[in-house]
C-alpha cells in the first residue's frame, strides 16, 4: 500500500511555503474572471498555512501564452483572491526575476505573495531543472494543491519536488480530496455505476473508456465522439465529426462492453445543422437519417429521454464531457438537460472537470453535485489508472 504525503504531517510553523495552485480560470474579453471556483478551492490550504504563521508564496499558470502578454497576467487572480480572503495579496511582476526574488525574500509571516504566470518562463512546460531550482530556493516547504496540472510533468509540478525531502513536501487539501474521490470512485462505487462520457474526440478518451468498462454497469456515450461509434455500427453520419482511424477501436469497445454485460447507450437522434453557428438552421433527426452535408451538433430530445431512463436507477454517476457544442446556445440543450437530470438523481455525482464543470455551472447545478473535479485531464488519467507525474513524488510506500 502507498499513501500521500500530506500538508497535515509537515511542521509548518513560521515556515516559508511555496504552494502550486491551479488558478487557470476562464475570463471574458475584458479579463473579468467568469468562474472563480478554482480560486475558492485553493483557499482552505492557503488559510491553513496562514494559521500556522507561514509566509505563503503562490504560483500558477494561466492559459497557454506563447510570449509574455498582459492578457495572461495573474493580476486579476490576485485581486479576486484578495477579495475572497479579505486580505492583501502581494503581486510579483515576474516569476524568478528580480522583483519576485526580492518580494519572496522580504515576505513576512502571514503574508501572501502571488508570482506572475509560471508559463511566462519557457522552462515551466519543459520540466526545466534550473527553473525548478530557482522556484524551490524561495521556500522551505513545497505544497502541491493543483490537481488540474498533476498529469503534466512541469517544472513547478514535478522537477521542483526533487529539492525538498519528504518532511518538507506534501499534498494540499484540494489535491488530497481529488485523489481520494477518484480512487474511491474506481475501487468502491455504489452500484449501479453509470459513466457518462462526451466531448469531441474518442482519441482523448479511448484509454479511459477501455479502463472503465470492467468497472461500470452502464456507459452513456454522447458528444462528437458518439459519431465514430455510430459509424462503427454502420450509420451514415453526414458531415458529423468522425475519427476514421478509430472506427475499429470503437467496435472493440462496443464488443468488450457486450462481453462484460455492460449496457452501452448511444444517441438515437441528434440536433443537426449545416454549419456550427448560432445562426444555423437546425433540425432534430434520427441518427439513421442525418442528411448528406449536415452534421450532428447535440443530442436530440429522444436521446435525452433515453439517457434519462438509463440514469434513473444509478447510485454512482461519473460525467466527463459535454453532449454537444455547448458553447453555442442552440446546441447546448442536451448538455444542460443531462446536467439537470444528473443533479436531480439520488446518486453520488462526480463531474470530471473542464468543459463539463462549465456546463454544470451554466445549468446552475453546481451546488447539487456531490463533487466537481478541478481537473479534466488529470481526472481522466486517474480513471485510466495512470500514475500522475505531480502525485508520484508525493507518494510513499507505507513501509517507508
Swiss-Prot record:
Binding site for substrate: 22-24, 38, 61-64, 119, 152
Keyword Phosphoprotein: no
Catalytic activity, reaction form: (2R)-3-phosphoglycerate + ATP = (2R)-3-phospho-glyceroyl phosphate + ADP
Gene Ontology annotations of biological process type: gluconeogenesis; glycolytic process
Residues annotated as binding ATP: 205, 296, 327, 353-356
Cellular component GO terms, alphabetical: cytosol
GO function term, MF aspect, one: phosphoglycerate kinase activity
Protein location: Cytoplasm
Pathway(s) annotated for this protein in UniProt: Carbohydrate degradation; glycolysis; pyruvate from D-glyceraldehyde 3-phosphate: step 2/5
CDD domains registered for this protein in UniProt: Phosphoglycerate_kinase
Major location (coarse): cytoplasm
EC code(s) of this entry: 2.7.2.3
Key words of the record: ATP-binding, Cytoplasm, Glycolysis, Kinase, Nucleotide-binding, Transferase
Family from the record: Belongs to the phosphoglycerate kinase family.
Protein's UniProt name: Phosphoglycerate kinase
Naturally occurring in which organism (per UniProt): Campylobacter lari (strain RM2100 / D67 / ATCC BAA-1060)
Gene: pgk
Amino acid at each position: 500500500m502507498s499513501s500521500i504525503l500530506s500538508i497535515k504531517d509537515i511542521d509548518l510553523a513560521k515556515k516559508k511555503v511555496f504552494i502550486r495552485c491551479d488558478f487557470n480560470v476562464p475570463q471574458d474579453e475584458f479579463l473579468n474572471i467568469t468562474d472563480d471556483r478554482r480560486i475558492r478551492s485553493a483557499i482552505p490550504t492557503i488559510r491553513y498555512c496562514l494559521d500556522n504563521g507561514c509566509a505563503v508564496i503562490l504560483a500558477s499558470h494561466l492559459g497557454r501564452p506563447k510570449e509574455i502578454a498582459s492578457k495572461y497576467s495573474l493580476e486579476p487572480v490576485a485581486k479576486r483572491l484578495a477579495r475572497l480572503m479579505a486580505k492583501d495579496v502581494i503581486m510579483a511582476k515576474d516569476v524568478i526575476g528580480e522583483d519576485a526574488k526580492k518580494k519572496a525574500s522580504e515576505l513576512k509571516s502571514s503574508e501572501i505573495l502571488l508570482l506572475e504566470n509560471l508559463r511566462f518562463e519557457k522552462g515551466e512546460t519543459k520540466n526545466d531543472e534550473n527553473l525548478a531550482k530557482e522556484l524551490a530556493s524561495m521556500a522551505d516547504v513545497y505544497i502541491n494543491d493543483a490537481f488540474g496540472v498533476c498529469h503534466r510533468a512541469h517544472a513547478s509540478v514535478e522537477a521542483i519536488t526533487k529539492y525538498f525531502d519528504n518532511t518538507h513536501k506534501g499534498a494540499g487539501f484540494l489535491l488530497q480530496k481529488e485523489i481520494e474521490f477518484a480512487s474511491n470512485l474506481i475501487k468502491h462505487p455504489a452500484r449501479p455505476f453509470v459513466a457518462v462520457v462526451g466531448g469531441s474526440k474518442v482519441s482523448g478518451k479511448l484509454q479511459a473508456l477501455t479502463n472503465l468498462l470492467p468497472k461500470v454497469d452502464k456507459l452513456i456515450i454522447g458528444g462528437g465522439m458518439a459519431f465514430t461509434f455510430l459509424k462503427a455500427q454502420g450509420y451514415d453520419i453526414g458531415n458529423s465529426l468522425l475519427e476514421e482511424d478509430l472506427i475499429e477501436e470503437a467496435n472493440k469497445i462496443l464488443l468488450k462492453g457486450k462481453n462484460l454485460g455492460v449496457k452501452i447507450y448511444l444517441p438515437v437522434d441528434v440536433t443537426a445543422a449545416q454549419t456550427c453557428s448560432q445562426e444555423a438552421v437546425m433540425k432534430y433527426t434520427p441518427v439513421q437519417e442525418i442528411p448528406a452535408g449536415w452534421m450532428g451538433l447535440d443530442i436530440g430530445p429522444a436521446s435525452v429521454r433515453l439517457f434519462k431512463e438509463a440514469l434513473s436507477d444509478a447510485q454512482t454517476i461519473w460525467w466527463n464531457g459535454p453532449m454537444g457544442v455547448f458553447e453555442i446556445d442552440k446546441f447546448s440543450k442536451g448538455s444542460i438537460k443531462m446536467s439537470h437530470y444528473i443533479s436531480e438523481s439520488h446518486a453520488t455525482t462526480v463531474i470530471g472537470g473542464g468543459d463539463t464543470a462549465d456546463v454544470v455551472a451554466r445549468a446552475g447545478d453546481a451546488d447539487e453535485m456531490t463533487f466537481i473535479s478541478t481537473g479534466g485531464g488529470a481526472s481522466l488519467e486517474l480513471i485510466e489508472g495512470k500514475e500522475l507525474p505531480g502525485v508520484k513524488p508525493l507518494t510513499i510506500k507505507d513501509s517507508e
